[in-house]
Structures are given as structure tokens and as C-alpha cells.
């Protein structure tokens, strides 16, 4: 995809602060030693066959945007060793947790990126992904910040370009307004169908879902999550 054909990246980043608590020395070492070996270089052209990105022999490739502490992504990479995963997380402390998990249990079917996910989406070849996961993204509560929500017409266009026909876009959130926002955007987009027949389809977590620390905190505070699945036409 050429630079001229990229959808607009919008006004500002889709994520908030990049850094929280100071990193410990071991975490800093992982950023210096492990991340460079796993990080995708979007300055180079993407391979037409994305499966060649991975050390492991894989049959399909999925993308997780904003993986937080990496609980779900690390779980999925172990659960599906023949699927390649690209994980994007710009928050430094979240990436540090993921790198620590990989230091203990390496994954040969995983690549990482620690900056804006739209750069990866614009880098990917057409119809190259078997799935995109976006779980508990920043809801940007204030109305003036809604334009920074990751679910947008421009990003759904990006999803539509890189997803194979029949591939899934999965979205989970505990913020009702963002859930409704996502439903409205996806249902009016010509490339996506909502896969739901009744409340049980969005009130129950995905099969094999490991849960996340953020989700557990939301439940403790009395919020409920919705789990949406959309199919690329």
C-alpha cells in the first residue's frame, strides 16, 4: 500500500500516556535485547506472504491491537502454535509485562510492535490476516476525544483491506457507550457483518478466553463486558 493511499491517521494518537512506573533493570534489559529481535520493522516492505515473518511454521496470521499486559496474547500464542501473531502495544509498561512473560515462556510464532497500530495496518498486505482482536481499548470518555477512539470509519477501512474474507474482527469492552459506538460503526460499514443471534452471543466471553487483569478489575467495580464478533464479508 502506498503512502498516498493510506487513510488519514486522525488527529493525534489513539492511545494515552506511554509510560507508567519506572522499569526495573531486568525489564530495561528485555527492551534492549529481546524486543529488537521480535519487533516488526515497518520501514521495510512487508513480505507478501506474512507467514515468513515467523520463526515457527504457521498457517495463518492474526493481529492483536493494544494487548495490555499480554495475558490474552501470550495465552493464544501457546494455544495456537501454528498461527502467527502480531501484537501491538505502545504502553511501555504493558510491553514490559509481555516481554517478561516471553522471557520465561518464549513464543516462536509471535512478532511485536510498540508504536501506533495504524502503521502496522498500513504496512500489511491486502487480505493477509485471519483475524484482528481489539480488547478493552481506551474508551476516551469525553466527547471531544471520541475522534481518538480506535474504532472509526478510517480504521474499519484499514481492517477491511487487510482481513481475508470470512476473517473475524473481535472487540471487547466494559464501557457501554463504546460497545454501542462499535456496533453502530461496524453495522453501517459495508465490509462487516455482526455475528450474533441473541444476548448470549455478546454477554459471554469468547471460547477459551483467559481473562485479563483489566477485565477482573472492571468486574470488581461492577461493570459488565460485551464481546462482539464481526465477520469480514
From Swiss-Prot:
Disulfide bonds: none annotated. Residues 1-21 are annotated as: Disordered. Signal peptide: none annotated. GO terms for molecular function: tRNA (guanine(46)-N7)-methyltransferase activity. Gene3D superfamilies: Vaccinia Virus protein VP39 (3.40.50.150). Substrate binds at residues 142, 174, 212-215. Pathway: tRNA modification; N(7)-methylguanine-tRNA biosynthesis. Keywords: Methyltransferase, S-adenosyl-L-methionine, Transferase, tRNA processing. One of its GO terms (cellular component) is tRNA methyltransferase complex. Coiled coil: none annotated. Its EC number is 2.1.1.33. InterPro entries: SAM-dependent_MTases_sf, tRNA_(Gua-N-7)_MeTrfase_Trmb, tRNA_methyltr_TrmB_bact. The active site is at residue 138. It catalyses: guanosine(46) in tRNA + S-adenosyl-L-methionine = N(7)-methylguanosine(46) in tRNA + S-adenosyl-L-homocysteine. Pfam families: Methyltransf_4. S-adenosyl-L-methionine binds at residues 64, 89, 116, 138. SUPFAM superfamilies: S-adenosyl-L-methionine-dependent methyltransferases. PROSITE patterns: SAM_MT_TRMB (PS51625). Belongs to the class I-like SAM-binding methyltransferase superfamily. TrmB family. Catalyzes the formation of N(7)-methylguanine at position 46 (m7G46) in tRNA. PANTHER family: 3-DEOXY-D-MANNO-OCTULOSONIC-ACID TRANSFERASE/TRNA GUANINE-N 7 - -METHYLTRANSFERASE, PENTACOTRIPEPTIDE-REPEAT REGION OF PRORP DOMAIN-CONTAINING PROTEIN. This is tRNA (guanine-N(7)-)-methyltransferase. It comes from Brucella anthropi (strain ATCC 49188 / DSM 6882 / CCUG 24695 / JCM 21032 / LMG 3331 / NBRC 15819 / NCTC 12168 / Alc 37) (Ochrobactrum anthropi). The gene is trmB.
Amino acid at each position: 500500500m502506498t503512502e498516498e493511499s493510506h487513510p488519514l491517521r486522525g488527529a493525534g494518537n489513539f492511545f494515552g500516556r506511554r509510560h507508567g512506573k519506572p522499569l526495573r533493570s531486568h525489564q530495561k534489559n528485555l527492551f534492549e535485547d529481546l524486543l529488537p529481535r521480535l519487533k516488526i520493522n515497518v520501514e521495510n516492505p512487508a513480505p507478501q506472504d506474512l507467514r515468513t515473518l515467523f520463526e515457527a511454521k504457521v498457517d495463518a496470521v492474526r493481529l492483536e491491537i493494544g494487548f495490555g499486559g499480554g495475558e490474552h496474547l501470550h495465552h493464544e500464542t501457546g494455544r495456537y502454535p501454528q498461527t502467527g501473531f502480531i501484537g501491538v502495544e505502545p504502553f511501555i509498561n504493558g510491553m514490559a509485562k509481555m516481554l517478561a512473560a516471553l522471557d520465561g515462556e518464549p513464543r516462536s510464532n509471535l512478532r511485536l510492535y510498540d508504536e501506533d497500530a495504524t502503521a502496522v495496518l498500513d504496512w500489511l498486505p491486502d487480505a493477509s490476516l485471519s483475524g484482528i482482536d481489539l480488547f478493552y481499548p481506551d474508551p476516551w470518555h469525553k466527547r471531544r476525544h471520541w475522534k481518538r477512539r480506535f474504532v472509526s470509519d478510517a480504521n474499519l477501512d484499514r481492517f477491511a483491506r487487510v482481513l481475508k474474507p470470512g476473517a473475524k474482527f473481535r472487540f471487547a469492552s466494559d464501557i457501554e457507550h463504546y460497545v454501542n459506538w462499535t456496533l453502530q460503526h461496524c453495522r453501517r460499514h459495508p465490509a462487516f457483518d455482526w455475528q450474533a443471534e441473541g444476548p448470549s452471543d455478546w454477554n459471554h466471553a469468547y471460547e477459551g478466553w483467559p481473562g485479563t487483569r483489566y477485565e477482573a478489575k472492571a468486574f470488581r467495580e461492577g461493570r459488565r463486558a460485551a464481546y462482539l464478533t464481526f465477520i469480514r464479508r
